Amino acid sequence: FPGHGNTSADSHYGAVYVERTLDELRENELLPFQAGIDAGADLVMVGHLIVSDIDSEPAPFSYAIVTELLRQEMGFTGVVITDGLQMQAMTDHYSSAEIAVKAVQAGVDLLLCPLDLESAVTALKEAVESGEITEARLDESVQRILELKLKMGLLV
């Protein structure tokens, strides 16, 4: 999310820019995501895409993309996961600690494969202690994750 189809770069190796406007995305790339949401998709992966028309930050760090577009406008209520955080689109520009905090602030629930898990966890703990991230924000993610685990039969 929000759609890698109209790009020529690979976020495994560097930054990827989506040059479409938000209206163009709504008319193209967002259509299958909306269909999935309408059909009851439980999880959406946010790709390491920079959609310049929406935000200068990569999508996993963008409150405008994760919370305002995906959750509020498109009505997604499930779990949001990042693409692999070991990919160069992320690691060339951000530490694991920065990635963790920025993604959670944007509304992401799960962080996939941070290079340095310990520093990511420490940064999140410190962000909560300092008030940079509220406990309520973490509780939202925990609730969504537990609901998905329950639905999948992973909790008894």
What are these regions (language model features)?
Residues 1-126, 132-137, 144:
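Second-shell residues forming the walls of enzyme active-site clefts
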